[in-house]
């Protein structure tokens, strides 16, 4: 078991080792703890609104036609689970967020009304977060993204810098700014 923990730590270090956003330059990622999850839930809870080109949770990803208003509502259910509901454009999404003690990461899994499935892992990078996401589209195609998630809790703003390979149905880089409506 000890060897598995060491291996997972090494894999996470290699997997999450790249540094992209200015807010995180020079700051390595580290495995998440249950205490990090409690902090993450506090930062994420509430109703959020954004004017965005696309979101990672549905088939709007890669849209370049114009911005859409999206809403995201995160509710802390207990110390182990947060549920989410998102809506905007033509779709809605339901998700669950939890701490995975084996992966030492915060995991969010969601399914949208169009059949898009996404799984994101969040790990701390300094005081902020690094996220890797695997998206499975209804046709079976897979998209991989990574993001920096930057919370400004004092001002109720979360900025997400999303990076992908830029192919159809993905993004090269996109910045989404979410504003907390209420907790």
Show the residue positions of the predicted features:
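Positively charged n-region of N-terminal signal peptides that target proteins for export
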Residues: 1-5
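Bacterial N-terminal signal peptides
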Residues: 7-15
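Boundary at the C-terminal end of the N-terminal hydrophobic targeting segment
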Residues: 17-21
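N-terminal helix-cap/turn-to-beta initiation motif at the start of protein domains
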Residues: 32-49
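Central antiparallel beta-sheet cores of small beta-barrel/beta-sandwich binding domains
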Residues: 50-144
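Beta-rich strand-turn-strand
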Residues: 142-143, 151-153
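Low-complexity, intrinsically disordered Gly/Pro/Thr-rich segments
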Residues: 153-167
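Edge beta-strand at a domain terminus
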Residues: 163-183
């Amino acid at each position: 078991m000890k060897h598995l923990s060491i291996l997972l730590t090494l894999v996470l270090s290699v997997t999450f080792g790249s540094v992209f956003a200015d807010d995180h330059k020079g700051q390595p990622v580290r495995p998440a703890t249950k205490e990090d999850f409690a902090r993450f839930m506090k930062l994420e809870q509430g109703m959020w609104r954004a004017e965005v080109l696309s979101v990672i949770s549905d088939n709007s990803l890669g849209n370049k036609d114009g911005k859409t208003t999206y809403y995201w509502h995160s509710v802390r259910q207990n110390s182990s689970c947060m549920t989410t509901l998102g809506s905007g454009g033509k779709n809605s999404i339901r998700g669950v967020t939890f701490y995975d003690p084996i992966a030492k990461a915060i995991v969010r899994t969601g399914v949208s009304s169009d059949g898009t499935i996404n799984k994101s892992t969040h790990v701390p990078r300094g005081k902020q977060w690094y996220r890797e996401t695997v998206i499975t589209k209804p046709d079976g195609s897979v998209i991989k993204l990574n993001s920096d998630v930057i919370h400004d809790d004092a001002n109720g703003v979360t900025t997400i810098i999303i990076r992908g390979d830029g192919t159809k149905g993905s993004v090269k880089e996109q910045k989404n700014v979410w504003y907390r409506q209420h907790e």
